């Protein structure tokens, strides 16, 4: 206010929308806005009307809200801002970004740098490659993988019209190799990986030279304000001030003292640069998710084993003093885990068990009914040994399946997920 009263003031472009909203709310100061200021506000407020061309291949498959996401990303880049695409999980953030990358490549002039870098958790690296091959097969893309020598060669030979895909961990290791490259676009997936701004991963991501930066996350960005600051420090350094100033003026008042003014100020500042849509708001044509609890009472030998193990645990606890109880918590948790395993299938605890399991039988019945109805199924278990039992039963029932465990390599996992999505079938799990 002091600067405005003196006559003129200049603000960074990323402050324009916030300043405009504040000026509309008060009449104490009469302000004249120059043409550049007005044009910027108009561009950002009418971004859905910009006539950015959606590539023909994606035009046919994008939903309405995904097209809006594409226009939003293009508008941010056009105005030299960064942003957070925070759509709910399952709304196709990857597809929106791939459409944006493909449009950038198609619009580029000969010799113009359109090199892009996608940084993602290791488990999603090959998924990004598969999605590019599926939705934009003409988009040149390379997964930076292999040993140190191979990765350095891939980075060194990256063309100006190429998308490089790497993991957060490998970026940290290969940072020196990237220092000679300039990127037109830098994208971080699962942006919460840089939530702690002092970590080596966060510092590495921010050292890459890039013209336009975009962060993807499926969680509400206001959940943790220090995380939000770190992400914006990557996108537009200085936008949320230094962390010390941000913490003093916004984070502490909002979090510790529930200061609504501080939170409102933050929301007004970030609103133009965050796009979040929820499934319930944009997928109105889809039915609500139905949840149903099904109970399978224990029977015969399985019930006897469960009751015997329960009695054993009860006797063990009854004989312990308070001091012994406090020191045997891990043992007690192990016994409770065994009870859960007996509920799944007693053979997980008792070697050589040949009896039935009511829970296993119900599971197989549900699977068979779903398969007969032409449905796909995702089946989870906390016990890999239970997955082994299910694999035997599925083979016997001639039900095709894939089995993913912690020992499945990233490459194999990506192949399986792709095959499952494409309805390619195999009889044997790896």
Question: What do the predicted segments below correspond to?
Answer:
Residues 1-42, 112-113, 228:
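Charged, low-complexity intrinsically disordered regions
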Residues 30-258, 265-430:
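ASCE P-loop NTPase motor core, strongest for the SF2 helicase catalytic module
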């Amino acid at each position: 206010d002091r600067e405005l009263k003196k006559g003129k003031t200049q603000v960074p472009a990323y402050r324009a929308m916030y300043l405009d909203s504040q000026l509309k709310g008060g009449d104490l100061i009469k302000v004249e806005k120059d043409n550049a200021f007005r044009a910027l506000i108009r561009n950002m407020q009418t971004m859905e009307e910009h006539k950015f061309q959606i590539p023909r291949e994606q035009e046919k498959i994008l939903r309405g809200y995904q097209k809006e996401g594409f226009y939003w990303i293009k508008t941010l880049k056009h105005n030299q801002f960064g942003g957070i695409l925070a759509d709910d999980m399952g709304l196709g953030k990857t597809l929106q970004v791939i459409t944006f990358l493909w449009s950038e490549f198609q619009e580029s002039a000969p010799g113009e740098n359109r090199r892009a870098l996608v940084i993602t958790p290791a488990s999603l690296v090959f998924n990004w490659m598969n999605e590019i091959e599926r939705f934009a097969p003409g988009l040149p893309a390379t997964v930076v993988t292999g040993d140190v020598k191979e990765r350095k060669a891939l980075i060194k030979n990256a063309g100006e019209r190429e998308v490089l895909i790497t993991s957060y961990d490998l970026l940290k290791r290969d940072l020196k190799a990237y220092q000679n490259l300039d990127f037109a676009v830098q994208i971080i997936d699962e942006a919460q990986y840089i939530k702690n701004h002092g970590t080596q991963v966060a510092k590495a991501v921010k050292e890459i030279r890039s013209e336009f930066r975009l962060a993807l996350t499926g969680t509400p960005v206001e959940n943790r304000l220090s995380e939000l600051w770190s992400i914006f420090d990557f996108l537009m350094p200085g936008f949320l001030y230094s962390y010390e100033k941000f913490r003093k003026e916004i984070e502490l008042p909002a979090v510790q003292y529930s200061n609504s003014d501080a939170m409102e100020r933050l929301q007004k500042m970030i609103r133009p640069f965050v796009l979040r849509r929820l499934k319930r708001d944009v997928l109105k044509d889809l039915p609500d998710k139905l949840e149903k609890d099904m109970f399978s009472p224990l029977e015969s030998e399985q019930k006897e084993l469960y009751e015997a193990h329960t009695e054993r645990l009860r006797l063990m606890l009854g004989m312990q003093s308070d001091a012994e109880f406090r020191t045997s918590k891990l043992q007690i948790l192990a016994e409770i885990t065994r009870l859960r395993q007996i509920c799944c299938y007693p053979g997980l605890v008792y070697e050589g068990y040949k009896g039935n399991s009511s829970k296993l039988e119900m599971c197989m019945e549900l699977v068979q009914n779903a398969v007969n109805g032409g449905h796909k199924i995702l089946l989870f278990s906390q016990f890999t040994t239970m997955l082994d039992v299910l694999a035997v039963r599925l083979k016997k029932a001639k039900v095709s399946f894939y089995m993913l465990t912690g020992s499945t390599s990233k490459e194999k996992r990506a192949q399986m997920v792709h095959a499952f999505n494409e309805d390619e079938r195999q009889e044997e799990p790896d």
